[in-house]
Structure formats: C-alpha cells, structure tokens
C-alpha cells in the first residue's frame, strides 16, 4: 500500500507506517497543483494531511486514492462532497489534541485576565506600571461559558473546576440530565450563555450551520469587559461583530484561529483584528504540542493498519455508520471483471435484499 504524507508528520508515525509494510512517500510541502500532480503520478492509495487543503481538483485524477486521513480533528480543509462522489473515504483523529487545545485556551484566558502580553511589552520597553496592571478581575467565582461540548469542551469544563468557576454550556446534544452529571448548567441558547458568562470559550466544528455562529446578536449579549476565546475555527465567528464588541463594549479576545490564515507554516499575516487593544493572538497552534502530535501519529497509524487489514475505516466522517440495513457486506477485490456480479448473484439466489 502506497501512502503519501503531504504535511509535517512525526518521525514515529512514519516509522509506524513503514512497519505496516506501506511504501511511504514523505513530501511535507505539497499543496495545490503540486499535490494534485503527485497524487496522479504516484497513484497513492492513502493520503495523510494536517493543514494542507485537499480540493476536488486534487482528487480528480487521483485514480488510486481510497482514503484521506486528516492528522487532526477538523476536516473543513477537505472537500468531503468531492471525496464521497469519488468513493474516497475521509477519516480524522478526534480527541487526540483535546488537552493541548484546552491548555492553550486557558493560557489565553489567563493572559487576557492578567494582561500578560501588555505587561511583557511594557517591561521590554523599560516601563514599570504596577498600578495599572494590579487591576485584574480574577477568575475564581466567575462563570465560564463553553460553546460546543465535544472532547475539547469537556476538557475546558474539567479545568474550570480547578479555577473554582461555575460552568454554563451550550451544545445541540446537551440536555439537563447530562449537564447535571457533569456538574454544569445548560444554557437554553448561546445568547443566554453570553448573558451569563464572564468568559466565553468556543469549541465548534466548522459546518454550514456554524459558519458565523458567533454573530452581532451573540456579542451584543455578552457582558461589557468579558473575555472571548476562540480556538476552534476562525469562520465560526463574525469578525466584524467581534471588532465592534472589542471597540464598543471592551470585550477582550484571545484568538488562535482566523478566517484568513497563511496556507503554509510561514507567511504574511494581514488580519488587523490582532492590532486592537485587548486582543491577544496566537498562530493556530492549539493542537501543536509534542504530546498531541505523538498521539495523532499513533492514531493515524492505527487507522491505516485497520484499513489495510480489513478495508474498514475507523473514524470515517463521510460514511454512514448506522445504515438502515441489518447487515453490512464489504467486498475487497482486485478490479477483476465479474467479481461483483458473482457476489450480487449469490446474494440474490439466497433471497437476500441488498442495496
């Protein structure tokens, strides 16, 4: 099995893939037309990516491609519709970077509450201003609002208890019973959450429904001077509305993600939101700890191992996991003429309905 790794990837992961008997092509700077070309040239069966975009054009001539593994959680950089149309499975590594992202989110919260960045800049410029920086509000006794209660959101809740904070959360799948089990309060809406929270942390996957989710009405409901943190995807926030909230309500923002980010590891960053007073930004590195990347590498190897051995795809995001049928038949063959016809004929002869 030929595996093309088109992003930076842990050495242990490359070793693990080779140990499976895979032919590993490690080309961590592929993107755009170059990626499309290499997929066509190599006839790779598996593509592993982190931040590289996998477009419909990239998959169009990738005749050998059967599986795309996103070495991370979010899959918004992969054209799922195009992949599904070409019978290419897409898998991810959910939950493996949850602790890392939660740690950065809390780092941003603390940095905003204690104005750590402003203090560091003043000290570097030879300015001592203890009187100004002694005005921090503090976190203990306050309310943390968590928007999205997946694995990262749950890690946020766990750490909030150490800060003696009350937690109110909103999720489509959260009910009062689950909230009670977690020792938190369920918000009826994101607006109710915004009204109640001293700190809001967003942990949403980017979908058609969540694009621009935190909008003008949401920021209008936030408390003046509250803290807003986004470590999910830049597109879930209406940035113009956020800028107004910063300027008009003194909302402080910690952002690890932005709607327009450079496509590579380095580049020019032109989003002026980070120049606003009260805004702290980082370089979309929430998941980028050694611990998280090691866990993701191990999960990627596991996914390829299972796929190579059985044809099944762990963590598939574009396959139906619970079809209406009572059984699933998976046929792996070498493209020989008549194989599927024989299988279907055998099923029909046995009176088995299939689709």
Describe the predicted segments one by one.
Residues 45-46, 67, 199, 227, ...:
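Short, Asp-centered acidic motifs that coordinate Mg2+ and/or phosphate
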Residues 65, 140-143, 216, 225:
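Phosphate-coordination loops involved in phosphoryl transfer and adenosine-cofactor binding
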